[in-house]
Amino acid sequence: ADEHTTPARSIAGMGDHPCAMAFYGAIVTALYKRERTGKGSHVSSNLMANGVWAASVLAQAKLVGAKFGERRPRERALNAVTNHYQCKDGRLLILSLLNEDRQWPTLSRCLGREDLVTDVRFETKKDRHAQSLELIKIFDETFVTRDLAEWRKILDGNGLVFGVVGILDDIPTDQQ
């Protein structure tokens, strides 16, 4: 990838499922240890590391010569609410609205685009997917009006699921 390549869109649960397996194994092992020794254990896992582990299958496949189809550009994504967008400060955020019908009015309000809720082009999930190219353009124009920190407050404050594409400057303050 070059500097102009945007990140791949992730699938739901890409890190959550491996974390669940890691925690299951850690908890069962800790309980077994306690049963045998009478001593407890501290268990932990890491969403980021487990997400990387989950994606490692693709990396391994590539190492042995697998061929992958061309990735659809983000501007042509099939679903605008599970896509990434650039903020005013150049940072990228990734929307991940999996309960789209319920969250659509909230997202529209957060974007200051209440008009989208009643726009017949975007009335249903099916409509939004059919008009995803237009919706992506609208989102692009909207997200670029505020810095990432502002969008974080707005989206977090309204319970919308999103992620931030990390950069090296984030490492010292990353909670993971």
Show the residue positions of the predicted features.
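Active-site-adjacent "lid/gating" segments in soluble enzymes
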Residues: A1-L93, L97
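Residues in well-ordered alpha-helical elements
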Residues: P18, P105, A149, L168-D169
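Conserved PLP cofactor-binding pocket of PLP-dependent enzymes
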Residues: D156-Q176
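Aromatic-enriched alpha-helical interface/lid elements that frame and gate functional surfaces
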Residues: V81-N158, F162
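Beta-rich nucleic-acid/ligand-interaction surfaces
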Residues: G51, A130-Q131, D170-D174
